[in-house]
């Protein structure tokens, strides 16, 4: 059976502001199954943003586990991410999950990879998913050459990725913490 795949999630941090956004397309093979999926959410009393890419069921499973880790560690984003990554590497069932997460709070942005790695992005910019490289390149160029806000950079980056990646559409959901 084919896997659901394809999306773009991008995050930009500037100063004390962070934006995290994603498109809404869910693709199965060469068919668009849904155009308005919500892949970016606020969790932990609206203090943490999370976006996910990869297999839909896998992503939701990881999201649930990540929320539980946040609760256990009183909202400490880094600790929750590291603990999730440890579980991901040691649990046989989790190792089979094909998904990635970007998480952000008021001070920290992290990428949690399918290998169980936790990455702190350079220059406060990161992206995942099939259109991630397009969005990240656009975000870096915009951040280096404009005074746009993180939200504006995320919006424009997703627009560019949607123009270039067949698995990314223009239905965007963007969340911010300021």
Curated annotation (Swiss-Prot):
Question: Which residues catalyse the reaction?
Answer: 7
Q: Which residues bind Na(+)?
A: 162, 165, 168
What does the UniProt entry say about where the protein is found? Cytoplasm
> SUPFAM superfamilies recorded for this chain?
N-terminal nucleophile aminohydrolases (Ntn hydrolases)
Statement: the UniProt record of this protein carries the keyword Nucleotide-binding: no
Is Protease among the key words of this record?
Answer: yes
* Residue ranges of coiled coil: none
Q: Which reaction does it catalyse?
A: ATP-dependent cleavage of peptide bonds with broad specificity
Q: What are the alphabetically sorted keywords of the record? A: Allosteric enzyme, Cytoplasm, Hydrolase, Metal-binding, Protease, Sodium, Threonine protease
Output the superkingdom of the source species. Bacteria
One GO cellular component this record assigns the protein to is: proteasome core complex
State which Enzyme Commission number(s) the record gives: 3.4.25.2
Q: Which GO terms describe its biological process?
A: proteolysis involved in protein catabolic process
- Documented activity regulation: Allosterically activated by HslU binding.
Give the main localization category.
cytoplasm
Under the heading HAMAP family, the entry gives:
HslV
Oligomeric and partner information: A double ring-shaped homohexamer of HslV is capped on each side by a ring-shaped HslU homohexamer. The assembly of the HslU/HslV complex is dependent on binding of ATP.
Which NCBIfam families does UniProt cross-reference here?
ATP_dep_HslV, PRK05456.1
Assigned protein family:
Belongs to the peptidase T1B family. HslV subfamily.
Q: What does this protein do?
A: Protease subunit of a proteasome-like degradation complex believed to be a general protein degrading machinery.
Q: What is this protein called?
A: ATP-dependent protease subunit HslV
* The species this protein was found in: Burkholderia lata (strain ATCC 17760 / DSM 23089 / LMG 22485 / NCIMB 9086 / R18194 / 383)
The coding gene here is hslV
């Amino acid at each position: 059976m084919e896997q659901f795949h394809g999306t773009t999630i991008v995050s930009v941090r500037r100063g004390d502001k962070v934006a995290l956004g994603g498109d809404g397309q869910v693709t199965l093979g060469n068919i668009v199954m849904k155009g308005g999926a919500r892949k970016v959410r606020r969790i932990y009393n609206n203090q943490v943003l999370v976006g996910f890419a990869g297999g839909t069921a896998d992503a939701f499973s990881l999201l649930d586990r990540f929320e539980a880790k946040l609760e256990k560690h009183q909202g400490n984003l880094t600790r929750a991410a590291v603990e999730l990554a440890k579980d991901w590497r040691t649990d046989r069932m989790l190792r089979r999950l094909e998904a990635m997460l970007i998480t952000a709070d008021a001070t920290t942005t992290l990428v949690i990879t399918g290998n169980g790695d936790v990455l702190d992005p350079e220059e406060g910019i990161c992206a995942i998913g099939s259109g991630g490289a397009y969005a990240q390149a656009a975000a870096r160029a915009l951040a280096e050459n404009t005074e746009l806000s993180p939200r504006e950079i995320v919006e424009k980056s997703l627009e560019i990725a949607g123009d270039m990646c067949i698995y990314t559409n223009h239905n965007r959901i963007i969340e911010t913490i300021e």
